[in-house]
């Protein structure tokens, strides 16, 4: 199995409507932008929606995940859909949102979530700055 650090720098090839697209794992700024969009798109209720267990809210979270990732990492998809600059993907109709969400869940989410899990594990394995009685910065 490849080292996850190497996987983070590799280009993933995905296909949307017959067009192959290259995507790299988000850098720190992009990761934060994705998470900020999730918060904005959910009106600050992303965690509540995710934890609710309500089918419609779980679907809404899936839509939010898809749109947030596409907005930040796959601007080519926006261009293919002729979404005007400055307009959010959240303004697309429900049929297109469903298509984008299904595509994201099939081609992006397994890869992205797997690498995020590996980052969490690696981060949790590292000692805190204060574990050894070090001074606060």
What are the language-model segments listed below?
Residues 6-13, 19-137:
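Short, surface-exposed, charged amphipathic helix/loop patches that serve as local interaction elements
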Residues 1-5:
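Short, basic/low-complexity N-terminal boundary segments at the transition from targeting/disordered tails
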